[in-house]
Amino acid sequence: MPRKGPVPKRDVLPDPLYKSKLVTRLINQIMVDGKRGKAQKILYNAFELVAERSGQNAMEVFEQAMKNVMPVLEVRARRVGGSNYQVPVEVRPERRQALGLRYIVNYSRLRGEKTMEERLANEILDASNNTGAAVKRREDMHKMAEANKAFAHYRW
């Protein structure tokens, strides 16, 4: 805990091309070693591929993918009487978004396609169709929360 009170949240600026803060946060998630230009290029090319393959607006497909990937529940470890319990808790809206973006980018990196643009585009398309590794990760989180529902009364 900082002594000087809570640290203020930094607000991200909306993306110049898509006018969306969510897109800026995705660019920040893709970015490695501060190379924002490269991350933007990857995302914009991926969005072009998404629009081409789906025949829809890339932004709408991405928003649908985010809805399908963002977890509602997660489990957190809580120590009670010498043993650790996995306690299911609801995920705050901002964390839901952060986790969704992280899952999409991380599982894109693990895919087998040649370029990051293709991997990201395919992961977004898969997520919008409720398939893919990122959606599976969310389902696994929900299953864990469901399995540990008995410990819900340990919430804090």
Curated annotation (Swiss-Prot):
GO terms for biological process: translation. GO terms for molecular function: rRNA binding; structural constituent of ribosome; tRNA binding. InterPro entries: Ribosomal_uS7, Ribosomal_uS7_bac/org-type, Ribosomal_uS7_CS, Ribosomal_uS7_dom, Ribosomal_uS7_dom_sf. Gene3D superfamilies: Ribosomal protein S7 domain. GO terms for cellular component: small ribosomal subunit. Keywords: Ribonucleoprotein, Ribosomal protein, RNA-binding, rRNA-binding, tRNA-binding. It holds the Pfam family Ribosomal_S7. NCBIfam families: rpsG_bact. PANTHER family: RIBOSOMAL PROTEIN S7 (PTHR11205). Part of the 30S ribosomal subunit. Contacts proteins S9 and S11. One of the primary rRNA binding proteins, it binds directly to 16S rRNA where it nucleates assembly of the head domain of the 30S subunit. Is located at the subunit interface close to the decoding center, probably blocks exit of the E-site tRNA. Belongs to the universal ribosomal protein uS7 family. This is Small ribosomal subunit protein uS7. It comes from Oceanobacillus iheyensis (strain DSM 14371 / CIP 107618 / JCM 11309 / KCTC 3954 / HTE831). The lineage of its organism: Bacteria, Bacillati, Bacillota, Bacilli, Bacillales.
